[in-house]
Design a protein with these regions (language model features):
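Signature tryptophan residues that serve as conserved aromatic anchors
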Residues: 154-156
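Core segments of small alpha/beta cavity-forming domains
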Residues: 17-92
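Hydrophobic/aromatic beta-strand elements that line small-molecule binding cavities or substrate pockets
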Residues: 113-116, 143-149
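A mature extracytoplasmic/lumenal domain signature
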Residues: 40, 53-54, 85, 120, ...
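Low-complexity, intrinsically disordered terminal/linker segments enriched in charged
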Residues: 2, 139, 159-188
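Surface-exposed, charged secondary-structure patches
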Residues: 93-133
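Amphipathic, hydrophobic N-terminal targeting peptides for secretion and organelle import
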Residues: 1-13
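Short, cysteine-centered beta-strand-loop-beta hairpins and adjacent loop/turn segments enriched
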Residues: 132-141
């Protein structure tokens, strides 16, 4: 598996989620809520998986998730992912009184760690650990498998099976075997 240096990695706030970026590996463009312009190397693949995967979520509203899914997600589950995000957003926005396609609010989650499952210059498979608050002050962790492919001069994320990130995620009880992100973000 590739060795990537996390030295020089910096973090920026995306609606309460600290996301990693690198001056050398990207993202180089974060306009309009989309993160693009990743290096064609292992660090670029890792940063793309985190930045694109987080954005392909109903939480951020249709302006962001639609642009991300249509432009940066590929594979047979893409249409289902878009439909699932829209349905989740519609339901949550009604119950929370959010109007005009606005984001549903900040998220209380940290991107904590990763593990390589596979890497070639054409594709990579990365298990990404996210942590959030659980019952009684505990921290709950999940590992989500993200697949990226080099397509059209940038990394794209392959949609999860059935267009549901839950089909690619599993609860995690230990960070053994994972590489912790360092710096401002990545850690609860």
């Amino acid at each position: 598996m590739p060795q990537v240096s996390l030295e020089g990695l910096r973090w920026y706030d995306f609606y309460g989620v600290e996301l990693p970026f690198s001056a050398m590996a990207g993202p180089r463009d974060t306009r309009r809520g989309v993160a693009a312009g990743f290096a064609h190397d292992p660090l670029g693949a890792l940063l793309a998986s985190v930045n694109i995967g987080v954005r392909a979520n109903a939480q951020w509203g249709p302006r962001i998730f639609t642009a991300v899914i249509r432009g940066q997600i590929t594979g047979p589950g893409t249409a289902a992912l878009l439909a699932n995000c829209q349905a989740s957003y519609d339901q949550a926005s009604r119950s929370e009184g959010v109007t005009g396609g606005q984001p549903l609010g900040n998220a209380d989650v940290a991107e904590e760690a990763f593990r390589w499952a596979a890497y070639t210059p054409a594709a990579a498979v990365i298990d990404l650990v996210s942590a959030g608050p659980g019952p009684q002050g505990t921290t709950v962790r999940a590992s989500t498998r993200l697949q990226v492919v080099w397509d059209g001069g940038d990394w794209k994320v392959i949609a999860p099976p059935g267009g549901d990130w839950g089909n690619s995620a599993a609860e995690l009880s230990s960070l053994s075997g994972y590489t912790l992100f360092s710096g401002q973000g990545g850690g609860r």
